[in-house]
Amino acid sequence: MKQLALALALTGTCVLGFSVSANPASALETYEAQMAASDAASQARVDMLEAFGPKPLKPGQYLWRDVPASAGSERVVISLADQMAYLYRGETLVAASTISSGRDDKPTPDGVFSILSKTPMWRSKKYDNAPMPFAQFFDPAGIAMHAGYNPGVPASHGCIRLPMAFAKKLYTVTDIGTPVYIGG
C-alpha cells in the first residue's frame, strides 16, 4: 500500500476523484501527496531504528552507511515532526541526519517534490545574501535543501538546513529529478 501511495503521488494518477499532480509546484496542494509524504516519514522512523539502532542523533549529527548503487534509485524523505532527513537507495535506508526546517511563520512545504536544480554554492537573493552551500532546490519559490545552521528545531525561512558534511555527501548522490518526500 505504501508503494502504491508513493507511486500515485509521483505519477499524477487520479484516485477517487482526487488528482495527484507530478508537478512539484502543485504537489503540496494535494492531499494524496501530503499523505504519501507523511507515510514515507513514518516508515523512515521505523527503518532508522532497524538500520542504526535507537540512539537519537544530536543536532548537526548524521549517520551514513555504504549501500551499493545497484540497490536502486535515490529518494530523500524529510520528517518535519522529527526534524530528520533520510536518504534511501531503492528500499534501503542509506543515511539519516538531523535538519532544521522552516519555523512557524515560514513553514517548509509538505508533499512530494523532485529536485529541480542544484548548485554547489548559492547565495539567497531574498535573505541578505545568506550562503546556501550544496543547494538542491525542490520548489520553484526557491525552497531548497542546503548546508546551514542546524539547531535541531525549525529555524529556517522554509528551507531544509542540513549539517555541512551530510549536505555535501547528499549533493554527490542525488540528481535533478530525485524525489523528495516532505511530511510529518
Label for each model-derived stretch:
Residues 2-134, 141-184:
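N-terminal pre-domains immediately preceding structured catalytic cores
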